[in-house]
Amino acid sequence: MAHTLPPLPYELDALAPHISKETLEFHYGKHHQTYVTNLNNLIPGTEFENLSLEDIVKKSSGGIFNNAAQIWNHTFYWNSLAPKAGGAPTGKLADAINAKWGSFDAFKEAFNKSAAGNFGSGWTWLVKKADGSVDIVNTSNAATPLTTADKPLLTCDVWEHAFYIDYRNARPKYLE
């Protein structure tokens, strides 16, 4: 089964001025597409050839895992963003965040601090734990909560390609 680049849920310029059209053209159109192309080149004739993307991520290793996980992580990331969105959550998520950090503002501070300190390339996630609590988890490279008992709720891509065009080496500015 050939995998395809999922469409963005918004136009390439919809996240400006926070994330520019140029960044999305490279990040989505080049990096994300390359992971799709690489995966499609790696899986023919393997046990992964006819599996769903999530199953490939959960069952593979090496290059197949890296490319499949990066497709999944990026798709989740694009769907974590929206034009003219943001603000504090409501309901059970707000309750869980307040129970852990005391306030949404304190959560944002903790999330940004964790993401800024995530060494090298990787991802910072808000996850729901098996006991229903929430936590912030940093992963390196292509690692993803999809391979753990944690349920991803939100992610931020902290690979340099996610922010370098717009923010150069100022990861904290990107996180704002």
Question: Which ranges hold each PLM region?
Answer:
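Feature for soluble, non-membrane regions of globular proteins
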Residues: 1-176
